[in-house]
Swiss-Prot record:
The N-terminal domain probably binds unfolded/aggregated proteins; the C-terminal domain interacts with ClpC. This is Adapter protein MecA. PANTHER family: ADAPTER PROTEIN MECA, ADAPTER PROTEIN MECA 1. NCBIfam families: PRK02315.1-4. Homodimer.
Length: 249
């Protein structure tokens, strides 16, 4: 485990999957308010050398963000003299087994306002490069450059009518790896952006993968820039791997 102080009131604790396993924890344990989760946080706090201003500081709130190979826990202190508040993790009732609905509820509660904003590097670099091409190149040169960029990367926006369809999509693509993925909600519709790296693949790879995606998803009627501006982002990176790795009941 590693700890980094972000500000006077916020710590970031990075917990590897090996750390979780050693403590008998799973990713889904963070999605419900239960005694096991509370005990784990007390244990982590005992094991780490907390800054002095976090010791006996009153109420602490926790926000959990799953990553591809770890869990990031953001610890925020307040001046209220109360016990640890674990309600920030979720407001769901106890359940037996993780259902898609419960997982989605936890995502909406915990992730859409998270403060650890890390750019979705590959997609952002792709968009930035295309923008620079637009602004600096003549039309013939621009066409050649854009074609070269698209040969290396392509991205798709997929739509899902409900969260069950998202789960089916992730389960149906268990063995598929992508360069990047984001997960959004807009109204009652869910969206996922998928970035594919094409440089080492045959010419037909992109079309084959898109056809495979559409076996489980729908063609989106929104672009990624539109979703970035208007939709709620539930996972801003590694959305597909996280959903693939989750065990559904």
């Amino acid at each position: 485990m590693e700890m980094k102080q972000i500000s006077e009131t916020t710590l970031k604790i990075m917990i590897t999957m090996e750390d979780l396993e050693e403590h008998g924890m799973e990713l889904k344990d963070f999605l419900i308010p239960q005694e096991k989760t509370e005990e784990f946080f007390y244990t982590v706090m005992d094991e780490l050398d907390l800054p002095d201003n976090f010791k006996n500081s009153g109420m602490l709130s926790f926000r959990v963000t799953p990553r591809k190979d770890r869990v990031d826990v953001f610890v925020t202190k307040s001046d209220l003299k109360e016990d640890l508040d674990f309600n920030d993790l979720s407001d769901m009732e106890d359940y037996s087994g993780l259902s898609p609905e419960e997982f989605l509820k936890a995502l909406e509660d915990n992730f859409m306002d998270k403060g650890d904003i890390e750019a979705h590097h590959k997609l952002e670099e792709h968009d930035k490069t295309l923008k620079e091409v637009d602004e600096t190149m003549t039309e013939p040169a621009k066409e050649v450059a854009e074609e070269t960029i698209r040969e290396d990367y392509t991205h798709y926006v997929l739509a899902f009518s409900d969260f069950d369809q998202v789960v089916t999509f992730a389960q149906g693509l268990k063995n598929v790896s992508v360069e990047g993925s984001e997960f959004y909600k807009l109204g009652d519709v869910y969206y996922m952006t998928i970035l594919l790296y094409l440089a080492d693949e045959p010419d037909y790879y992109a079309n084959n993968m898109y056809a495979r995606f559409l076996e489980y998803a729908n063609v989106a009627d929104r672009t990624r820039p539109y979703l970035q501006e208007h939709a709620t982002i539930l996972m801003e990176e590694d959305a597909l791997p996280v959903l693939q790795a989750t065990k559904w009941s």
